[in-house]
Structures are given as structure tokens and as C-alpha cells.
Amino acid sequence: MGKRASETLAASYIKEYGLNVKLCRPAYIYGASSLTDDRVWAQFIANVVKKENILLKSNGAANRSFCYVTDTASAMLCVLLSGENGFPYNIAYEKSNTTIRGFAKTACEAFPERNIMLSFQNSEDEAEPQILKTPLSTEPEILDSTRLKALGWKPSVTLSEGIKRAVKVLEEQNR
């Protein structure tokens, strides 16, 4: 079931049965997953764990909101305890908004001693993509967490720090 459909169903239950429902819209949640996870961010983290170069299969221009798993959990608790019934709260750390390319670069830069390089499957993707901002352009994958922060939530894990934590956990699990 889609996210919006779930929210509509929740709104119906609030109206029909008076249920107390809190709604969260999380960004891309990242953290220590598994080394075989096929999500792109998880593949980049696995590359760092395995000390392998990162290969992008596109120009990596897609913009995303990311939020480390512990920040996401604390945000959900904040919404549960202080959020308005039936009101959706976006969970994102604006300082972690980046492109897929940016996530890959951050993963490489988080461990400079490993000399992990970023490469591209297609040479035409190597040039830094131009991301045009126009009044008509929208970025549905970028979330605004202003309402959540108004409840007192404060994210604390930067993208680089989150990648370092995830790598550390995976290395400990795979010894």
C-alpha cells in the first residue's frame, strides 16, 4: 500500500472511530544494513567495508533526503509523544540532503586512509551534473522537517558520521 493511501486510511479511522494516530513520513533511512542489501546507499557503505571502489551506474544527480536510523527513531518517538493526531511529520535531516553522487563521495571521503575511489560505469556521467532550479521544478524526494523540529526534535548524526557508524557496525558484525 502506498504512503498516501496509508495516510488516507489512517485519516478515515481517526474520523470514523476516533483513533489516536500519529503520522511519520521518513526520508531515506540509512545505517548498518547488510552487505548484500541492494539499496544504493547500502551498496556504497558495503563498498567501504570491503575496501572496494564505488561504481556509479548513472550520473548520480538524483537528489534525496537522508536520515540516520537513530535520528529517525528519535523523531518517531518525538511524534508519538508530542505530535498532533492525524498530522503528518516529515523526518529528514536537511544537512544530509544530497545527491546519490554526493552520498557516494561522502562515503569515499569518510575513510580517506582506504583510498576508495568513485568511478562511473559510463564515461559521459563523469562530468558533474547541472541541477537546474526553476520555479516549476519540484523535488519530491527532499523533505522539510520544520514541523517536526517545532516539536523539539533535533537530529544529531551528519551524513559523514552516519556512514562512519554504519561501517563500524558492519565491520564488527563481519569479523
Which sequence ranges carry the predicted segments?
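C-terminal substrate-binding subdomain of Rossmann-fold SDR/epimerase-dehydratase oxidoreductases
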Residues: 48-175
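Active-site Tyr-X1-5-Lys
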Residues: 1-22, 49-50
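Hydrophobic alpha-helix immediately C-terminal to the catalytic Tyr-X-X-X-Lys motif of short-chain
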Residues: 5, 9, 13, 44, ...
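Active-site-proximal flexible loops/turns
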Residues: 10, 32-38, 78, 97, ...
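Short-chain dehydrogenase/reductase
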Residues: 1-7, 38-42, 65-66, 97, ...
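Flexible, glycine-rich beta-alpha linker
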Residues: 19-40
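Short, cationic motifs built from Arg/Lys/His that form the positively charged side of catalytic pockets
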Residues: 3, 25, 32, 64, ...
